[in-house]
Amino acid sequence: MAVESRHASEPAVLDAAWLRELCLEHGADDVGFVSIDDPSMVDERPYALEVMPGTKTLIGMVRRTNRDNIRSRARSVGNAEIFNTGHDIDETNDAIVKELDALGIRAANPSTAFPMELPRYGAPRVWGLQHKTVAVAAGLGHMGIHRNVIHPRFGNFIILSTVLTEARVDEYSKPIDYNPCLGCNLCVAVCPVGAIKVDAEFDFLACYQHNYRQHMSGFREWVQRIAESDDGDDYPNHFGEAQTAAMYQNLASKPIDYLSGYCLSVCPAGEDVIGPFLHDRKQHVREIVKPLQQREEVIYVSEGSSAEAHLRKRFPHKRPSYVTNTPRLDFDLVETSPAPPAPEDAA
């Protein structure tokens, strides 16, 4: 491992094998390295430099999740798994940064998920780095049809994270030369709002309105409903008891409540995952896919939308609930706006 002084004019150049072992020792299940000058990082560069000026290398990592927790029909189990694994990999990142810092090497670890830069709410990105983009460039997998990264071994049962460092690495990673996605389209079949399509673009709005209901969009509507209520007795006419309880839970415990995520649950890709699917596809569908399709639940959609039409046609036993204030906000989220200025360009 080559290490230079913190005050040297040129940053350290680290041995890739040493850095990889460091990350694995602290809990990462796989790791790859990307230069900030890599063409694939052109959109991430300003966000990386906003987090830490002088960034030279992005360290992409994955941590495995428990597959059966993610597959559970009890969404509280899947949500707890996502939160707990995210917490674990944040601790991994922190330990790596501290060890590099002890060696005189600057490093920073943006959060895996929350907290985000929510004062930017309404801009296209309230998070810092796009961990998916880094992971693909770092050789940790490719995006499947469901827009999640599929690791060649662990499948989509992973949480992604990124560490930034001023050091360069003597050997950078490359994207893998194949996509682990099987094209089985089980994610298409299980999505209650029809957001995932074989022959069309991903419907961001449909996914966001339902899956992220307990996040900012639902919270904003909840506040509006409180303001519109005449008094406590009138409040249940505007926001149901079950909705209130769900909002309370998301605020009081872990800000990670997703209402669906079924696309992750049913995905059979990945060397460690695919065996049972290849052995008996019908059993995979019967035990994992069908229970999620048959689950009776409320699905949040815009009235008259393609998501509502899909829901009523494919899942008539699931009940639509109309969202009233999110379309404007959601479209704002996907509009383009300037990225944060690079430090050298900032006034």
What residues fall within each predicted segment?
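Polar/charged alpha-helical tracts
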Residues: 17, 21, 25, 102, ...
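Short alpha-helix boundary/capping motifs
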Residues: 51-52, 128, 219, 291, ...
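Compact disulfide-stabilized, cysteine-rich extracellular microdomains and processed peptide cores
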Residues: 123, 280-281, 285-292, 297, ...
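Long, compositionally biased charged/polar accessory segments in the mid-to-C-terminal portions
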Residues: 303-343
